[in-house]
C-alpha cells in the first residue's frame, strides 16, 4: 500500500478513494492498479470503451473501478433503469452463464437502440464484465478513504496525541499495544512506563509531549480501582507506598491489582526499588485494610499511630534489586510484553553474528532470513481439507 500510494502521488480525495478500491487481490493480480497509476501520470493514454463513457469513467482515467460505474455505464449506453443496472451488477458478480447471456442480450438490444453497433456493444459488454469482476462499492471506499485521510493527517501533524488515542483504543489487546509501542519507537515518540502518580486509565500526552502509559492496559488492575486512585490523587498526594495504602481503599483493588501495579513498575515512583514494591504488597493490603488507619485519615491525622522516626522500608533493607531478566519477566507477566528492554537485546553481540535480519528489517522481497526471537505462543488448527496449520507468534524486541 505504501509503495502504491507513493507511485500514485494522489492530488485529490477521489484518488485516495480509488486507491483503496484498487488495493485488493483482484485488481492487484489483474494489473488494474498499474494501469490506473500510468494513466494518472500520462505514461499510458486515457481511453474509453465508448465516447459516452467519458462522463462515467473520467474520474478514474478510463478504468472501471467501482460497481456504481458498471451500473452507470449500463444506464448511459443501454438505457437501463437503476433497478435493471443493479440486476446486471449482481449477475456479473455471480458469473452464472444463463443470467449473463440474458443480460448480454438485453444490454446489446439497449445499445443498438442508442445507435451503438451490435459488434461494438458486444465488445463493451465483455470489457465491462471483465472489470466488474473486481469492482468495489464506491460508497464503502469513500468512507474508508475519509478515515484514512483523517488518520494520516493526525498521525503526521499530531503524532503523540494520535498514537495515545490509538493505544487507548486497544487497552485490552496486548499484541496490538506492543505493536503500537514499536511504532511509537519508530516515530521517535517516548512512551513512559506506568506511574501511579501521573498515569490515567487511558494513554495520555504530558506537557513534554511524552505518552504516559495507561493503567487500564495493565493486566489484572480493576477499572474501579484505577478510577478511585485517580480521584484520590487529585486531592491527596502520595509520598510512599504506605501513604498510598492508607489514602485509598485497598479493597477496591485487592492483591491482584497491587501485584500487577508493582510488577509493571507503576509503584517505582513511591518505592526505593521495584523489588521492594513487589515484596510490600502483602503489608500494603494489611496496612490499608486496618480500620484504625481509616479513622486516622478521617480525623486528618494520618500518622497518629507512628513515630516520626519510623522507617516503613526498614524490614526490606536486605532485599536485592531485581536483575534485568527478573524485571523483564515481571513486565511480561503484568503488561503482556517486555517494556524496559528485551531478552534478545541482552545478547545483541551474539545475535548479530547469527541472524541475518531483525523483524523490523523484514520486507516482502526478502525470501529467506534467519531470525533470533522469543516464541510467545503457538496455535495449531486444521484447514478445510483437514491439513494441520501452525501459527507461531514471536518477537525480537523490534517487532512482532
Where are these regions (language model features)?
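Noncatalytic, beta-rich nucleic-acid-contacting surfaces in large DNA/RNA-processing enzymes
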Residues: 1-400
Amino acid at each position: 500500500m505504501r509503495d502504491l500510494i507513493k507511485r500514485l502521488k494522489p492530488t485529490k480525495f477521489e484518488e485516495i478513494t480509488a486507491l483503496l478500491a484498487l488495493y485488493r487481490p483482484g485488481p492487484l493480480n489483474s494489473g488494474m492498479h498499474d494501469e490506473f497509476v500510468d494513466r494518472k501520470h500520462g505514461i499510458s493514454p486515457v481511453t474509453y470503451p465508448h465516447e459516452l463513457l467519458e462522463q462515467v469513467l473520467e474520474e478514474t482515467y478510463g478504468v472501471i473501478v467501482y460497481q456504481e460505474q458498471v451500473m452507470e455505464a449500463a444506464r448511459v449506453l443501454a438505457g437501463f433503469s437503476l433497478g435493471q443496472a443493479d440486476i446486471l451488477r449482481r449477475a456479473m458478480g455471480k458469473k452464472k452463464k444463463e443470467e449473463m447471456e440474458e443480460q448480454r442480450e438485453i444490454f446489446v438490444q439497449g445499445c443498438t437502440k442508442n445507435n451503438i453497433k451490435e459488434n461494438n456493444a458486444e465488445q463493451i459488454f465483455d470489457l465491462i464484465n471483465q472489470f466488474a469482476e473486481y469492482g468495489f462499492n464506491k460508497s464503502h471506499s469513500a468512507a474508508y478513504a475519509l478515515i484514512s485521510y483523517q488518520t494520516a493527517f493526525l498521525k503526521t501533524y499530531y503524532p503523540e496525541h494520535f498514537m495515545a488515542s490509538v493505544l487507548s483504543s486497544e487497552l485490552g489487546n496486548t499484541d496490538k499495544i506492543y505493536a503500537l509501542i514499536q511504532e511509537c519507537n519508530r516515530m521517535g515518540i517516548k512512551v513512559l512506563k506506568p506511574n501511579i502518580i501521573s498515569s490515567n486509565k487511558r494513554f495520555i500526552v504530558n506537557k513534554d509531549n511524552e505518552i504516559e502509559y495507561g493503567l487500564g492496559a495493565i493486566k489484572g488492575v480493576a477499572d474501579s480501582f484505577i478510577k478511585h486512585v485517580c480521584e484520590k490523587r487529585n486531592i491527596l498526594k502520595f509520598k510512599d507506598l504506605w501513604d498510598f495504602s492508607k489514602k485509598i481503599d485497598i479493597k477496591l483493588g485487592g492483591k491482584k491489582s497491587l501485584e500487577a501495579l508493582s510488577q509493571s513498575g507503576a509503584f517505582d515512583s513511591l518505592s526505593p526499588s521495584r523489588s521492594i514494591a513487589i515484596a510490600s504488597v502483602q503489608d500494603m493490603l494489611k496496612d490499608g485494610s486496618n480500620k484504625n488507619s481509616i479513622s486516622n485519615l478521617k480525623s486528618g491525622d494520618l500518622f497518629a499511630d507512628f513515630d516520626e522516626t519510623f522507617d516503613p522500608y526498614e524490614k526490606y533493607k536486605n532485599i536485592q534489586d531485581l536483575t534485568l531478566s527478573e524485571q523483564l519477566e515481571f513486565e511480561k507477566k503484568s503488561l503482556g510484553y517486555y517494556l524496559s528492554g528485551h531478552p534478545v537485546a541482552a545478547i545483541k553481540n551474539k545475535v548479530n553474528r547469527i541472524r541475518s535480519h531483525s523483524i523490523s528489517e523484514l520486507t516482502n522481497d526478502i525470501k529467506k532470513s534467519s531470525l533470533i526471537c522469543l516464541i510467545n505462543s503457538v496455535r495449531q488448527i486444521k484447514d478445510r481439507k483437514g491439513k494441520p496449520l501452525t501459527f507461531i507468534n514471536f518477537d525480537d524486541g523490534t517487532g512482532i
